[in-house]
Structures are given as structure tokens and as C-alpha cells.
């Protein structure tokens, strides 16, 4: 498997490679669905079956002999990290394609900045077959002019009048995310269902804010082209119906499917440096004092408003006391066994950036039914490069989910290696784990990457 240190510049992406032997590393519903444990959605099963054939051919090209039954399930994770993560993940995928490794990936999962990259890629049908061209289109867009204020305000009004719950997520998506990704992406995930049979299966991770705050229930929430739901609890709804109103498992009021711009808006909360920065925001979001949290969100929103043109400020201030990512709870008042009671009680739930809790989407691929053999984690986090993986290991231990031991020495902390391979076969389903340290700096040069 190839490990690397990423040196990310806005005008180029360069790599330092450390090679090892790849063969060594590879040792729509109208109601809510809850499937039996160890059973994927039928559409995902079909996708995975087809993708595994692609993986098998890719392994053969790399001179790795493998039977169809023994094809490894490999997941690539992209962490948060705002623009650093967006550019870093794009560069990583480009290099993997050049090395013949991209077609070995079964799942591609991301949080925060990595999802901005994913959203740009999955706009293009079968993007992995023309990645160099897609990369140039992304670079050209990011180097070009931003979204006009007129278009942004029109989109904000469309969000406001188009659904029951209009929150700060809509504001962030329209007024902040568009300033970074330089577009208003109105594609939806369900439109992608038949467009990516040659690409890895995409998973976008967020968290349930109420479950996070109460430390009860399942906070780990995932969204893919087919369904949205709780990764560990195993309760899902068709992605096209996520956000619609449900009662006892039946849809009673339809809401239009969210678009990709809105989804990217869920990925910025922990990335901005307003009113004291990321650490202060996360600390505030973790507090049990709801009044303090509301005051902080108000000041946070006001800071955003002050950075914007005077046009639309009044709209922003009206939203200063509002919340993030509110949707109807598709599990509201459901009955039956094996459904966490804490998820059934409220009519609405709030879904926010997963980076607030864990800055990489481990739990989307640690579902036992996905049977992952190898996890490749690209960490673009700012600060301690080991914090996320250590937090993931600790959480897995508490939840009794098989996860390799992560032993970081004092020398590693002073001088991280390019990558780490963790594997301790204590359990049948323990995946081999590869952690890649992505050291990144960002600078500007002639508005090019």
C-alpha cells in the first residue's frame, strides 16, 4: 500500500511516497425501514457487488492474485479540515488513480471539508474514469469568480420558502460555502443513483446533535444516494424522504429532497474561526447550558453577518437565535423492538457537522454489515494528527466495536511518520487499519492550486 505525506499548496499538490508491498497490507420507500442486522440496503448490495468486480480487476493489474470471493473491502476516509481537506483529498485521489489504486477502493466516506471535494467529484458521472479532466474543472472553478450576491440571495429565499424548517445551515450553505466552493450546487443525491457504477460508493457523515448532547442513543448519522440513517442503530429512511414528516413510520407530509449545497452547509460549523475559533465553538456546543449555547450561536451568526454585504443582513439577524440542521424526525413515535427510545420522542432532530464529535467518518464504515477489511484514513486535521484516531479507538472500546489498538509513542508525537498500519487480529471482523498523516500548508500563488 502506498503511504505519503501531502504538501498541499493552492497552486500545486506534491507528494512524498513511501511504498510497501500492497499484498502485505491486504492480508424510494414510503415508510421507515429497519433491516435485520448484517443486511445492507438492496441497492447498496447491488452496487457493492458490481464494484467488487472492478476491485478484482484492479488487483489483477497490480499483479495481486485474488479470487472473487476473497476480494477485500477497502474504505477510504477523508477527515475534516476545510479547504485543506478539500484540496488534500482531491490530490490524494488523483495520485491513487495514477498509481492504479483508486479502483481498489470500495467506499469513499468523508466529513466536513472532505465532503466538499466529494460533492464536486460526484457531480460528474463516473468521475473516476476521467479524474484528470474533473480535477482541472474543479481547479478552474475554485480559481474563478464566486457566486454573485444576487444569486446567493435568490437561493436563500428559495430555501426559506421551500421547506418547513429554515435554519442557520441554510445561511451557511448559501453565504459561506458558496464563497469557498464557488458554485450553487442544486444536484441531489438520489439523482446520482445510476451515474456512478464505476466509482466508489459515497457516504457523507453527520451527527445527531441531541444524541451527542445527551450521551444516549446513536449520534452517528450517514447519508448516501439510497438512504439516510443511524449507522449503528440500523434505522434508515430513503434519502429522497429524509426531511419529510413521519408518524409511526409512515410519511404524512412530503418535503423536497435537500440539495448538495445544503449538505455541504452541514459541514462547516466546526471549521470557521469566528468568535473565538473552533475550540471555543466546540466547547460551547458541548455545554449543557442551553442558554449559554444560544447566546454563543447568536454572536456567532452576528459575526457572519458583519462579514457580509449589507444586503441580506436583516435576514441573517432574524436567524441569529435559530438552530442548525433541523429536520423532521423520521423515527417519531415509531413502535417495535430494537429502536432506541431516545430517537423516537422528539418531532424534530438537528443534524450537524460530524467534526464536532469526531473529525473522521469511522463509524460509517465500521458497520458490521459492510464487512470492511482495510480502512485507509487520510487525516487533514489541524493540530494533533493522532487525536482523531485515538478518539475513534477509545469510542470503539466503549461501544465494544472491534478496532485495532493504536499505540502512539512519544517519538511519534514529536516526529510523525508518513503512515501507520495497525492490525491486531483479536476479532474476526477487526479491519486492517492504515492511518496516513497528511501534513498540509496552504498558501496563495496567482490564484492557482
Q: What spans do the regions from the language model cover?
A:
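C-terminal, well-structured subdomains that either form a transmembrane helix-short loop-helix hairpin
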Residues: 72-90, 340-389
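Helix-rich "cap/lid" substructures immediately adjacent to catalytic or cofactor-binding pockets
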Residues: 52-105
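Low-complexity, highly charged intrinsically disordered N-terminal segments
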Residues: 3-65
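Patatin-like phospholipase A catalytic core
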Residues: 101, 124-125, 134-364, 371, ...
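Acidic, Ser/Thr-rich peripheral helices and adjacent loops at domain boundaries
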Residues: 125-143, 292, 314, 385-430
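Amphipathic alpha-helical interaction motifs in eukaryotic regulatory proteins
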Residues: 56, 90-97, 106, 118-123, ...
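Short acidic, glycine/serine/threonine-rich loops at helix termini
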Residues: 118-123, 215-217, 387-390
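Catalytic nucleophile loop
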Residues: 79-82, 104-121, 204
Amino acid at each position: 500500500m502506498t503511504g505519503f505525506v501531502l504538501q498541499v499548496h493552492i497552486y500545486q499538490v506534491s507528494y512524498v511516497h513511501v511504498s510497501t508491498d500492497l499484498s502485505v497490507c491486504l492480508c424510494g420507500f414510503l415508510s421507515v425501514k429497519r433491516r435485520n442486522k448484517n443486511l445492507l440496503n438492496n441497492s447498496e448490495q447491488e452496487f457493492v457487488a458490481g464494484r467488487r468486480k472492478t476491485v478484482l480487476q484492479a488487483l489483477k493489474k497490480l499483479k495481486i492474485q485474488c479470487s472473487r470471493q476473497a476480494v477485500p473491502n477497502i474504505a477510504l476516509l477523508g477527515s475534516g479540515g476545510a479547504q485543506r481537506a478539500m484540496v488534500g483529498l482531491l490530490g490524494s485521489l488523483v495520485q491513487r488513480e495514477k498509481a492504479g489504486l483508486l479502483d481498489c477502493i470500495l467506499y469513499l466516506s468523508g466529513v466536513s471539508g472532505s465532503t466538499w471535494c466529494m460533492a464536486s467529484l460526484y457531480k460528474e458521472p463516473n468521475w473516476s474514469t476521467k479524474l484528470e479532466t474533473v480535477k482541472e474543472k474543479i481547479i478552474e472553478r475554485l480559481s474563478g469568480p464566486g457566486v454573485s450576491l444576487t444569486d446567493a440571495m435568490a437561493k436563500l429565499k428559495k430555501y426559506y420558502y421551500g421547506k418547513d424548517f429554515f435554519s442557520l445551515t441554510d445561511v451557511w450553505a448559501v453565504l459561506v460555502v458558496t464563497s469557498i466552493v464557488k458554485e450553487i450546487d442544486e444536484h441531489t443525491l438520489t439523482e446520482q443513483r445510476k451515474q456512478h457504477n464505476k466509482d466508489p460508493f459515497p457516504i457523507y457523515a453527520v451527527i445527531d446533535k441531541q444524541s451527542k448532547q445527551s450521551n444516549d442513543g446513536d449520534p452517528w448519522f450517514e447519508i448516501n444516494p439510497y438512504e439516510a440513517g443511524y449507522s449503528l442503530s440500523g434505522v434508515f429512511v430513503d434519502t429522497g424522504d429524509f426531511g419529510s414528516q413521519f408518524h409511526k413510520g409512515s410519511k404524512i407530509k412530503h418535503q423536497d429532497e435537500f440539495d448538495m449545497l445544503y449538505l455541504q452547509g452541514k459541514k462547516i460549523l466546526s471549521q470557521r474561526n469566528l468568535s473565538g475559533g473552533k475550540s471555543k465553538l466546540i466547547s460551547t456546543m458541548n455545554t449543557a447550558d442551553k442558554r449559554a449555547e444560544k447566546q454563543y450561536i447568536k454572536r456567532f451568526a452576528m459575526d457572519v453577518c458583519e462579514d457580509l454585504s449589507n444586503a441580506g443582513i436583516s435576514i441573517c439577524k432574524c436567524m441569529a437565535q435559530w438552530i442548525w440542521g433541523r429536520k423532521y424526525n423520521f423515527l417519531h413515535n415509531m413502535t417495535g423492538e430494537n429502536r432506541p427510545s431516545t430517537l423516537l420522542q422528539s418531532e424534530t432532530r438537528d443534524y450537524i457537522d460530524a467534526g464536532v464529535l469526531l473529525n473522521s467518518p469511522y463509524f460509517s464504515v465500521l458497520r458490521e454489515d459492510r464487512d470492511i477489511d482495510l480502512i485507509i484514513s487520510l487525516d487533514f486535521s489541524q493540530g494533533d494528527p493522532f487525536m482523531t484516531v485515538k478518539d475513534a479507538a477509545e469510542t470503539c472500546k466503549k461501544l465494544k466495536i472491534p478496532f485495532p489498538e493504536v499505540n502512539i509513542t512519544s517519538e511519534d508525537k514529536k516526529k510523525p511518520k508518513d503512515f501507520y498500519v495497525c492490525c491486531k487480529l483479536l476479532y474476526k471482523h477487526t479491519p486492517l487499519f492504515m492511518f496516513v498523516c497528511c501534513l498540509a500548508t496552504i498558501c496563495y500563488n496567482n490564484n492557482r492550486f
